[in-house]
Design a protein with these regions (language model features):
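Lipid interaction determinants
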Residues: 1-101
């Protein structure tokens, strides 16, 4: 049985699947063949996850805010990255997240 202590910490993505069989091909293609990801799980019950296209180029422009980056570059960055956070629970070996932001 998985315990809370087993999952608290920082985890790197090693493989990615999909929970949407009707749209599996598009879902898996969104982040490419080598996606990168990070999951942070706190003992206080908070989590944060980020996934992006592996090897994607950095956003161009002024690194302070990138507001001067061309629209196409900003759209590519937006389309190849997702991050979310919220509360998590572990019940009967099932890890569940509640998206708050």
């Amino acid at each position: 049985m998985v315990t809370t202590e087993d999952i608290i910490g920082t985890w790197l993505l090693v493989d990615r699947g999909t929970d949407d069989p009707a749209d599996a091909e598009a879902s898996l293609a969104r982040y490419g063949d080598d996606p990168q990801g990070l999951l942070i799980i706190s003992k206080e019950g908070w989590m944060n996850a980020a996934i992006c296209w592996g090897g994607r180029p950095g956003l161009t422009g002024d690194p302070a805010w990138h507001t001067d980056a061309p629209d196409a570059d900003r759209l590519r960055a937006f389309d190849t990255y997702i991050s979310y956070g919220g509360r998590w629970t572990l019940e009967n070996d099932t890890f569940t997240t509640e998206v708050d932001f």
